[in-house]
From Swiss-Prot:
Job description of the protein: Catalyzes the conversion of glucosamine-6-phosphate to glucosamine-1-phosphate.
Keywords: Isomerase, Magnesium, Metal-binding, Phosphoprotein
GO terms under cellular component: cytosol
Name of the protein described by the UniProt record: Phosphoglucosamine mutase
Post-translational modification: Activated by phosphorylation.
Active site as annotated: 101 (phosphoserine intermediate)
Cofactors that this protein relies on: Mg(2+)
Pfam families cross-referenced by the UniProt entry: PGM_PMM_I, PGM_PMM_II, PGM_PMM_III, PGM_PMM_IV
Binding site residues for Mg(2+): 101, 241, 243, 245
Residues found modified as Phosphoserine: 101
Family: Belongs to the phosphohexose mutase family.
Catalytic reaction annotation: alpha-D-glucosamine 1-phosphate = D-glucosamine 6-phosphate
Length: 452
């Protein structure tokens, strides 16, 4: 990670850390880096989620892109994977998404996709950062001829919807489904897609006002959806996050089905169809021990990466795997798209239910999840989170807790990729043990580097 770019683009509090001035620079310098070798006029797609700051940042970013001669196509409010899909399909030079995903409305972010639809490599991000930090802006400044033009590309959302529907390979007639679009980007597509696929729908989190994105709705707050599933007697609920690159489901009983369980369900189905490349699923260090045991029993190999969907995708590309994801709900189907896609994942999950004739609770019951506890400790700043593992007291308590578990569980302490948080996670055979381990470590972390 560089000075400005984290694991998922540039993030910060809108108009405080991520300012219009920074957005302009990212547009100008990012656009130049991504299009400097184009033979014709470069074309860049820009999308955003529903945050109130999205229009402000989009205006500045687009101005920066236009200033270096780039033709900009404004997609408006669209899911992050929609930008990635359209860039690759239409042969655009690059794409930019303005979103802070599952973060609250006061935050925003800017992430770039290359012409191949994948997130930028570290080298390209460092090149952009070097231009931002240079003492002088030496990039071309055309005055009339050579400036870019801005085009509305609202039909891009409809193209993305059409693509999603083709992946269902049939319809979902007879299924009662609750959708939760998190008052976010999926509100422009999810209802239309699943209605066209003939599901019987109830939709919540579909009234964005610029401030309510992810507030008590969406994949990080599936409780409202779970309640609605039970109330309506639905077959399942499908919750997306603010930019709709994640999916968390709930079964017909209102029980949460997280990314681990969804990956197992879909991975096992793909294996049975001979469509799981190298019989392997790529996941991260956050995936539950019970998930790995279920994979082993099903005859599925697993490859484990660092946390972050970009690392899952890197591993998949490097070794030609086609399915992977994270416990948090990012799932990547490289046969269909280049990045995590919540709506695509939802369609694939429903497809497994349709093809097997099984309920979601029945499919999910094959994975026995170890009790897991995750606590996010807010620390003083990003420097504190990065150096946390060098603090002797923190090292000592982790070592003591690992010894006490005697190999029957695991501990993971890591910095957040996007916020000043230290994530403390443990798994153990019992809730009592996992609570003791996490609470003991959290107490020391808060004392040493926590926000007082």
């Amino acid at each position: 990670m560089g000075k400005y770019f984290g694991t998922d683009g540039v993030r910060g509090e809108a108009n405080v850390e991520l300012t219009p001035e920074m957005a302009f620079k990212l547009g100008r310098f990012g656009g130049y880096v991504l299009s400097q070798h184009e033979l014709g006029t470069p074309k860049v797609y820009v999308g955003r989620d529903t945050r109130i700051s999205g229009q402000m940042l989009a205006s500045s970013l687009i101005s920066g892109l236009l200033s270096v001669g780039i033709e900009v196509y404004d997609l408006g409010v669209i899911a992050t994977p929609g930008v990635a899909y359209l860039v690759k399909k239409d042969g655009a030079s690059a794409g930019v998404m303005i979103s802070a995903s599952h973060n609250p409305a006061l935050d925003n972010g800017i992430k770039f996709f290359g012409g191949d639809g994948y997130k930028l490599e570290d080298e390209k991000e460092l090149e952009i950062e070097a231009l931002i930090d240079a003492e002088e802006d030496t990039l071309p400044r055309p005055s009339a001829q050579g400036l870019g033009m801005l085009h509305d590309y609202i039909e891009g959302v409809r193209k993305y919807q059409a693509f999603l529907k083709t992946t269902a390979e049939g319809n979902f007639e007879g299924y009662k489904v609750v959708l939760d679009t998190a008052n976010g980007a999926a509100y422009t597509s999810a209802r239309a897609v699943f209605a066209d696929l003939e599901a019987n729908l109830t939709v919540i989190g579909e009234n964005p006002d610029g401030l309510n994105i992810n507030v008590k709705v969406g994949s990080t707050h599936p409780e409202a959806m779970a309640k609605k599933v039970v109330e309506t007697g639905s077959d399942l609920g499908l919750a997306f996050d603010g930019d709709a690159d994640r999916l968390i489901a709930v079964d017909e009983n209102g029980e949460i089905v997280d990314g681990d369980k969804i990956m197992f369900i879909v991975g096992k189905y793909l294996l049975g169809q001979g469509k799981l490349a190298q019989d392997t699923l790529v996941t991260t260090v956050m995936s539950n021990l019970g998930f790995h045991l279920a994979l082993e029993e099903a005859g599925i190999n697993s490859v484990i990466t660092a946390v972050g969907d970009r690392y899952v995708v890197e591993e998949m590309k490097k070794n030609n795997y086609n399915f992977g994801g994270e416990q948090s709900g990012h799932m990547i189907f490289l046969d269909y798209n280049t990045t995590g896609d919540g709506q695509l994942s939802a369609i694939q999950l429903l497809k497994v239910m349709r093809e097997t004739g099984k309920s979601l609770s029945e499919l999910a019951s094959e994975v026995t999840i170890y009790p897991q506890k995750l606590v996010n400790v807010r620390v003083k700043d990003n420097a504190a989170k990065k150096s946390a593992m060098d603090v002797p007291a923190i090292q000592k308590v982790i070592s003591e807790m690992e010894t006490s578990m005697n190999g029957k569980g695991r501990i993971l302490v890591r910095p957040s990729g996007t916020e000043p948080l230290l994530r403390v996670m443990a798994e153990a055979p019992t809730h009592e043990e996992v609570n003791h381990v996490v609470d003991t470590i959290v107490e020391v972390v808060e004392a040493e580097i926590g926000v007082k």
